[in-house]
From Swiss-Prot:
The organism of origin for this protein: Picrophilus torridus (strain ATCC 700027 / DSM 9790 / JCM 10055 / NBRC 100828 / KAW 2/3)
Family named by the database record: Belongs to the universal ribosomal protein uS14 family. Zinc-binding uS14 subfamily.
GO cellular component annotations of the record: cytosolic small ribosomal subunit
Residue ranges of coiled coil: none
SUPFAM superfamilies per record: Glucocorticoid receptor-like (DNA-binding domain) (SSF57716)
Protein name: Small ribosomal subunit protein uS14
Length: 52
């Protein structure tokens, strides 16, 4: 008996950070598509504010 293996689906998460290309820790909310490190560095320039 042979089992047929199918390739895993990627679900569209193959794109990395638009700034550095990292694929882990992505912030995709609001269409930002940045890793969390790049988001922390550029959040003020984008228009996000830190409250505390």
């Amino acid at each position: 008996m042979q089992i047929k293996l199918e390739p895993r689906k990627n679900f569209g998460h193959k794109e990395g950070c638009v700034r550095c290309g990292r694929k882990r820790g992505l912030v995709r909310r609001y269409g930002i598509r940045m890793c969390r490190q790049c988001f922390r560095e550029t959040a003020n320039q984008i228009g996000f504010r830190k409250y505390s």
